[in-house]
A protein has these predicted regions:
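Short hinge/gating elements
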Residues: 73-76, 105-109, 172-179
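Conserved DHp (HisKA) dimerization/phosphotransfer helix of two-component histidine kinases, i.e.
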Residues: 47-101
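Conserved catalytic segment of histidine kinase HATPase_c domains, centered on the N-box/ATP-lid region
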Residues: 38-50
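Glycine-rich ATP-binding loops of the HATPase_c
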Residues: 200-207
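Conserved ATP-binding N-box helix of the HATPase_c
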Residues: 14-34, 39-41, 114-143, 188-198
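Glycine-rich/acidic phosphate-handling loop/turn and adjacent ATP-lid/helix
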Residues: 147-187, 217
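Glycine-rich nucleotide-binding loop
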Residues: 208-215
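Conserved short strand/loop->alpha-helix "switch" segment adjacent to the catalytic nucleotide/phosphoryl-transfer site
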Residues: 5-15, 99-127, 131, 179-181
Length: 219
């Protein structure tokens, strides 16, 4: 990544913090609305709706927080190597709903924490490729390292669904273009590109027939 394509760490932290707050605002607001309904309403059906709203919103908020903790945080309790089953569980809780489905294939049981962060960050970016929902096919392979060498990671995320598209600006961010266009929408793509660069990996995004493919592979 070239010098003029590197965002200052303070700006990166501010943008990621803003995105996390923005993403959680909907769920927290819904929980608050449900609590207000419980305080104000005596109708049994309304109270049942309020409890259901609180429960569903709390689950969604927890899934978002758990995803953000591993993707953007230190997650020190997990150690340097993370069980891939845990990463998959975190990803599924965050992504899957009535409109989105995840299909997972991997040749390893554990991944380095930085690779787990990259995987989750790229998954978050890939959501923008299917605004109407669809299927996300995750293919992960890791070449076991020789002594004193790091594991070599290759990751493919294939996005298949109606109105599939390469998210505007993402390819430029992956290519290391000027950071002036980076905002809350593109900050995760930039974060993924920074992680990839530090790990001697490269990111790409493009069309594969009617599908959209995101690729992470060694330089």
């Amino acid at each position: 990544m070239t010098a003029n394509a590197i965002l200052e760490d303070t700006a990166l932290a501010a943008l990621i913090s803003s995105k996390i707050c923005h993403d959680l605002a909907g769920q927290i607001g819904a929980i608050n609305n449900g609590l207000e309904l419980l305080e104000e309403e005596n109708d049994e059906d309304t109270r049942y709706y309020a409890l259901e709203l609180i429960q569903n919103s709390a689950k969604a908020a927890w899934a978002q927080l758990d995803f953000n903790r591993l993707a953007f945080g230190v997650a020190s309790s997990l150690g340097a190597v993370v069980p891939l089953a845990h990463v998959e569980q975190v990803a599924r809780r965050y992504i899957e709903n009535g409109k989105r489905r995840v299909h997972w294939q991997a040749n390893v049981q554990d991944v380095e924490k930085e690779h787990a962060k990259l995987l989750l960050a790229l998954l978050a970016v890939s959501l923008m490729a299917l605004p109407a929902g669809g299927d996300f096919y995750v293919g992960l392979s890791v070449t076991k390292p020789k002594e004193r060498s790091k594991a070599r990671l290759k990751l493919i995320i294939l996005c298949r669904g109606r109105s599939a598209r390469v998210p505007e600006g993402v390819a430029d961010v992956f290519a290391g273009k000027d950071t002036r266009a980076i905002d809350g929408r593109l900050v995760v793509a930039y974060y993924a590109a920074r992680l990839a660069s530090e790990a001697s990996l490269k990111l790409s995004a493009g069309k594969e027939g009617e599908d959209i493919m995101f690729t992470l592979e060694p330089l």
